Amino acid sequence: MATKSFLKLAADLSSFTDSSPFAKLLDSCIKSKLSAIYVRYVHASVIKSGFSNEIFIQNRLIDAYSKCGSLEDGRQVFDKMPQRNIYTWNSVVTGLTKLGFLDEADSLFRSMPERDQCTWNSMVSGFAQHDRCEEALCYFAMMHKEGFVLNEYSFASVLSACSGLNDMNKGVQVHSLIAKSPFLSDVYIGSALVDMYSKCGNVNDAQRVFDEMGDRNVVSWNSLITCFEQNGPAVEALDVFQMMLESRVEPDEVTLASVISACASLSAIKVGQEVHGRVVKNDKLRNDIILSNAFVDMYAKCSRIKEARFIFDSMPIRNVIAETSMISGYAMAASTKAARLMFTKMAERNVVSWNALIAGYTQNGENEEALSLFCLLKRESVCPTHYSFANILKACADLAELHLGMQAHVHVLKHGFKFQSGEEDDIFVGNSLIDMYVKCGCVEEGYLVFRKMMERDCVSWNAMIIGFAQNGYGNEALELFREMLESGEKPDHITMIGVLSACGHAGFVEEGRHYFSSMTRDFGVAPLRDHYTCMVDLLGRAGFLEEAKSMIEEMPMQPDSVIWGSLLAACKVHRNITLGKYVAEKLLEVEPSNSGPYVLLSNMYAELGKWEDVMNVRKSMRKEGVTKQPGCSWIKIQGHDHVFMVKDKSHPRKKQIHSLLDILIAEMRPEQDHTEIGSLSSEEMDYSSNLLWDNAM
């Protein structure tokens, strides 16, 4: 249709008596977004008609060429012009900046005989749009210094540069300039300010600017919705969306994409379905690929994999974004085979796709598959990201594969990670390295990584404190906790679990009591069930059984099987059969089918020689239909897995194993003679055998 309109205007070029009709034709090319071929057609006619030396038509030709995709032709017109005016220079500079030829634009800018407001705005806007935001700010500062009037285009462009740099200090300075200008009430400037504060993570100021706006358009609402969706709380994004609808502002695809993303992060499936219904009724948006991708992602994250697959299959064009969302969705649904099939069928993969499947395997405990896929990623010359390494280190940690973890560490170093925040935030790669080393028992290596990190967050401190605690370095854990407080890092509930666990393993009862009682007062961390479990374990290990029992009974939440089990184990260690029987009954109320309480209680009676009570416990087990599953252990030696069951006598080295068992039992209980050792219950013998087999192979 646009081509026909152009041809109609160009029907009789030879009859044109001045250059104005040619200018109209060139405007038609620009407005209709025609290719440069049509501009060349007009250009040839201009030359034939004898108007090619008019500066007016030459300027229009430069403008048309640059806007229709052939800046080279426009530059040739510019270079051949005997005379140029400010419009001529601006047309070329604007064309260069819009197409990203920024260095060439800068060179031309510096050679201009004069500049005006339009010239400066083109430079600020062009550099901001192409992510050279520092230079955009410099041009803006020079423009202001040289006394040029700043208008709405100047402010919008420089705010975009501040957003690109996440530089709120500069943004605030620009905001104060705007406050002194006539543009504070401009709806586009208001929207740009909301967006700037949003991108800088300042939700409060974004909301304040929005609230102060006299007029708002769809861009204003989108900026605030996106602010909450990206910075949180995401539920506020849904509230703002509801206010937008009540204000009768029609949402566009940007609005809906942000709302769908908020629904995904909140698992707000009902609101997401309502938005989906709105889109289905809108012919214009129904097949929008961005919205389709967002819906696939939302349904996948909400564990509605069937709905996600339905939308995916309905998409006229599928891209890597939708396919990656499906991979993540299948992984969340524990369908790693379906995720791998989707991955295999992808025509095009990016590193995000690889990361999604690697993460899926680690989330589902298929760590060997994750490691294998990472090796394939390397063979196919895909450059891993910080997220790739974080997942692969998690797999190594879960498998306790120190050798592979160290290889992954070498790859991390080769990729130049510095463990600091920024555009590529890789602090959590350092955190993953710490976690891997401490879980593999290499606390010193984990601590070395911790000390070499250029920046640390709360997770870094937590990983190291818990690593110390779990590996028996109680003093070091508490010392590091004190250092954490001195650094100004605020502890969270995970930190306090590590601290209390360290006290428990080291037997620091008074310190544990102190830190538990000061959690809320000093750090604003209300004790959770896990903190009570740590305290019960601490008190139980130290023999303060009644205090541990009182703590459980005074908990503000219902005790679970873990906390009762911890106290029951302590009762066995300290041979408190009366309390042990009470705790076992409480534990069975929580988990009636758990064989653990029966076995521990039976062993306690056996240790005291109360064989009739042992038989009664066993009868109760049979009566309740509770059976004890045989234990299974394994160990990797020189790359080979050795697996064995309780009472398993099939191992080729069983004689050496049982000989060592006798020696170890004698060492473990030197104060008892062999007649006492012979009275060990079968469960205790099984348990000791397991320990021995681990050490003998």
UniProtKB/Swiss-Prot annotation:
Annotated PPR repeat ranges: 18-53, 54-84, 85-115, 116-150, 151-185, 186-216, 217-251, 252-282, 288-322, 324-349, 350-384, 385-419, 426-456, 457-491, 492-527, 528-558
Keyword Secreted part of the UniProt annotation: no
Keywords: Repeat
BP GO annotations: mitochondrial mRNA modification; sugar mediated signaling pathway
Segments of this protein annotated with the region Type E motif: 563-638
InterPro entries tied to this protein: E_motif (IPR046848), Pentatricopeptide_rpt (IPR002885), PPR_At4g14850-like_plant (IPR046960), TPR-like_helical_dom_sf (IPR011990)
Recorded GO MF terms: RNA binding
GO cellular component assignments: mitochondrion
Protein family membership: Belongs to the PPR family. PCMP-E subfamily.
Protein name per its UniProtKB record: Pentatricopeptide repeat-containing protein At2g13600
